[in-house]
Amino acid sequence: MTARSMDIVSMLAKEDVPVMGHLGLVPRKSTWIGGLRAVGKTADEAYELFQKFKRLEDAGAFSAECEVIPENVMGEISKRTDIVTVSLGSGKNADVMYLFMEDICGDTENPPRHSKAYGNLLRLRDEIKIERLKALKAFKKDSISGKFPGKKQSSNLEKKQFEKFLDQLD
């Protein structure tokens, strides 16, 4: 967060635009902190994170997505801020628990450690992919061999109407 970003949060909040911040791991900025990792793993880093929460709160944000923050740190920060804390991989001590639907439904091959799959959509997608390929190959084969389209998939003018049509063409 920069001083300018807090000015923007403040400006938006003063105009009654709800602002939700994003603290902890911010994947697009992960190279700045040494990669995809928990944020707040030392006392100093946890306190710095707490200060960011307070600055966000003071600027007028109503909430913050709290991504991959140690659970005990998240619990203490959540107790000490009035903004709604939304845990994404930050344990159960935030105000709201959040996961991506893809993770909940088991729709990813390598889900993040902090997620939990409650279904197995990936298996179903694989089955759909196999069935789709089977259908497309059968369609190609029938199209090349002349089996498709067949009489059931085609229509013709009745004989007199077709002859009239041919006369009109000439």
What are these model-derived regions, one by one?
Residues 1-121, 125-170:
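Alpha/beta enzyme core
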